Amino acid sequence: MAMVYIKMSFHNTIVTVIDGRANVLSWCSSGVCKFKGRQKTTAFATKIVITRALKSVLERGFNGIDIKVSGPGFGRNVAIRAIIKMGFKVFSLKDITPLPYNGCRPRKRRRT
């Protein structure tokens, strides 16, 4: 069983696939797929990144997958749908976006 980590930011999408022993099987990002600038955050770019990262995993014989998504980026649903369309069985889906519980003190407010 493989684990897929999808990190989505407002400027890029990075997908890393690891096996049960934490060895990286494949990875891909929007920039590697030749998307530049604001095209990197589109849902289409996310779909291409997912299919490119998981193609080699499918060839190795993995069919079950755990998905972990982090970040506030666009195209989360598109990413999950693309994984299911490729024929993988999704065992778990987690959102691991870090949320601060009143973390660092904010900067002072600007006076106008």
Curated annotation (Swiss-Prot):
GO terms for molecular function: rRNA binding; structural constituent of ribosome. One of its GO terms (biological process) is translation. Keywords: Plastid, Ribonucleoprotein, Ribosomal protein, RNA-binding, rRNA-binding. It is found in: Plastid. It holds the Pfam family Ribosomal_S11. It comes from the Eukaryota. The keyword Ribonucleoprotein applies. GO terms for cellular component: plastid; ribonucleoprotein complex; ribosome. NCBIfam families: PRK05309.1. Belongs to the universal ribosomal protein uS11 family. Part of the 30S ribosomal subunit. This is Small ribosomal subunit protein uS11c.
